[in-house]
């Protein structure tokens, strides 16, 4: 087992992508702390891990709450301290997104068609919440668990960036800018923590299959939405990503034997989406 006796903290562990990562780390022998807001989802992941004899702890927690993360840190330190941190918590908010893709002067006078929403109509509290969960939800856990990694002589952090880090998608203003920040933060923190032998990298998933994506993209098997057709047409590999497409990259970045000289990078896992200019 590659990660036997290692302790991993996985935030967003109740989601489709990070649950798969957590399960794979447990299969490799790591003790995994499952962090997220919804205890029911975390328990399902826990049950899967326990079904094959893996070791996991369910810990509902808000990653943007510094005090709550400090309490979590104490619990992790009691069993040996964190070796790996996966900052997978994050997301978007429909209230932070317009429904139109280009400025329309009518949005300034409230005269858009019924149901249409421009940039000036978005909910700023929702906008801030997206920045908070994606940026501070990465900064706070990293600073907490890096302290434990220092004591252990090193460790590895993997952040969740996005293809939006490089090229923003339409309507995703808050999400795109926050994910661009994650790529920059990954570089900044990698340089800062390098003297402590803490490596910090990021993965940038492309369009991945989960329950949320099925609603607005559809599926290749059951039929695509218009936006789904655009995505597949722009993805050289001709499909959406699956959660298990991420696990190999994650395990490589965590593995000290294979990536000990790798830090500060963001790895696209997107089926080639970013290789095309769109024309």
Each language-model region and where it sits:
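Catalytic Tyr-X3-Lys loop
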Residues: 102-140, 158, 182, 237
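Residue(s) in the substrate-gating loop at a strand-loop-helix junction
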Residues: 162
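Conserved glycine-rich cofactor-binding loop
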Residues: 14-16
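Short, small/polar-rich loop/turn modules that mediate ligand/substrate recognition or access, typified
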Residues: 194, 199, 261-263
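Short, flexible catalytic-loop segment of classical short-chain dehydrogenase/reductase
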Residues: 166, 204-216
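Conserved glycine-rich Rossmann-like NAD(P)H-binding loop of the short-chain dehydrogenase/reductase
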Residues: 30-44
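Active-site helix of classical SDR
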Residues: 142, 178
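C-terminal substrate-recognition "lid" of short-chain dehydrogenase/reductases
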Residues: 2, 239-269, 274
């Amino acid at each position: 087992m590659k990660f036997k006796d290692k302790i991993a903290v996985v935030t967003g562990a109740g989601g489709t992508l990070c649950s798969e990562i957590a399960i794979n780390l447990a299969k490799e022998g790591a003790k995994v702390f499952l962090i997220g807001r919804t205890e029911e989802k975390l328990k399902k992941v826990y049950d899967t891990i326990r079904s094959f004899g893996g070791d996991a702890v369910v810990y509902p927690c808000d990653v943007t709450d510094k005090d709550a993360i400090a309490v979590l840190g104490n619990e992790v330190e009691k069993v040996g301290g964190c070796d790996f941190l996966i900052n997978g918590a994050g997301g978007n908010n429909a209230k932070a997104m317009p429904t139109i893709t280009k400025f329309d002067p009518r949005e300034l006078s409230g005269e858009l068609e019924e149901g249409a929403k421009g940039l000036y109509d978005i909910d700023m509290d929702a906008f801030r919440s997206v920045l908070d969960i994606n940026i501070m939800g990465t900064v706070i856990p990293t600073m907490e668990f890096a302290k434990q990694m220092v004591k252990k002589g090193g460790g590895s952090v993997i952040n969740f960036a996005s293809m939006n880090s490089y090229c923003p998608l339409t309507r995703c203003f808050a999400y795109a800018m926050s994910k661009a920040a994650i790529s920059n933060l990954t570089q900044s923190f990698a340089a800062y923590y390098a003297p402590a032998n803490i490596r910090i990298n990021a993965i940038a998933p492309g369009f991945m299959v989960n329950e949320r994506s099925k609603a607005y993209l559809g599926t290749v098997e059951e039929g695509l939405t218009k936006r789904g057709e655009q995505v597949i047409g722009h993805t050289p590999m001709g499909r959406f990503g699956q959660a298990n497409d991420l696990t190999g990259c994650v395990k490589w970045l965590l593995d000290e034997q294979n990536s000990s000289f790798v830090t500060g990078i963001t790895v696209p896992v997107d089926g080639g989406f970013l290789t095309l200019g769109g024309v």
